[in-house]
């Protein structure tokens, strides 16, 4: 199988790592544009990132130091209900009690006039630990290898995957000039005026959506929330 991935960055090299894990005998090529640098923002994940990391064989002690990574156990929201509102935590993992009927707890909170986010502070050790930049490693309900997300440098992470997990992946620094379709399928790519053919193509060019080549639809008239901000506790 011949696979081409258009676009590098964390999405491109995560795709390459995934395909290499699934199809170790495949010929995989990542095409990176010399004109488009990877987006150099910090990356924040939930605990579900672990599922992928386990699948491709990432070990925390190997990649985290190289990518300025820290563990994340909760998401902290400030001014979520009202301006100057008390911040609240959205912790990962399971609560420290078994609730057969959590709806009873929420109804009780409502009748008392208390906010629902008090639920997390009362029943998740992780919520309190996050306020103090601690990990609840002694909590039997907390699993380090399951209940943590990450913060990391996205550019360093992409480079680490490229250099440590994708040594057998071919890398082309070039521009995709055009591509040819046969029906709904892409048949050829033209990269720096040279023709390339693959069995499977991945578009990792972000909003450019180079291979999809479809019209951008504006939904701002329907989506009234145009901004989002949060503090992430780690």
Language-model features: where?
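Dinucleotide-binding Rossmann-like beta1-alpha1 core, especially the glycine-rich loop
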Residues: 41-131
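Short beta-strand to alpha-helix junction loop
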Residues: 144-162
């Amino acid at each position: 199988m011949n696979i081409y991935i258009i676009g590098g960055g964390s999405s491109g090299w995560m795709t390459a790592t995934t395909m290499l894990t699934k199809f170790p005998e495949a010929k995989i090529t990542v095409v990176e544009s010399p004109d488009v640098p990877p987006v150099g923002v910090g990356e924040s994940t939930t605990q579900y990132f672990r599922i992928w990391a386990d699948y491709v064989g990432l070990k925390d002690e190997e990649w985290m130091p190289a990518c300025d990574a820290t563990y994340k156990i909760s998401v902290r929201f400030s001014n979520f209900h009202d301006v100057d509102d008390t911040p609240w935590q959205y912790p990962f993992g399971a609560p420290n009690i078994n609730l057969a009927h959590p709806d009873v707890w929420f109804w009780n909170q409502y009748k008392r006039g208390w906010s629902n986010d008090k639920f997390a502070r009362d029943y998740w050790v992780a919520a309190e630990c996050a306020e103090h930049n601690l990990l609840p490693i002694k909590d039997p309900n907390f699993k380090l290898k399951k209940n943590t997300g990450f913060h990391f440098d996205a550019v360093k992470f992409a480079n680490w995957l490229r250099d440590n997990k994708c040594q057998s992946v071919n890398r082309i620094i070039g521009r995709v000039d055009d591509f040819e379709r046969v029906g709904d399928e892409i048949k050829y790519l033209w990269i720096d005026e040279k023709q390339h053919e693959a069995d499977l193509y991945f578009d990792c060019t972000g909003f450019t959506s180079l291979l999809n080549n479809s019209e951008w639809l504006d939904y701002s008239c329907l989506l009234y929330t145009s901004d989002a901000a949060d503090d992430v506790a780690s």
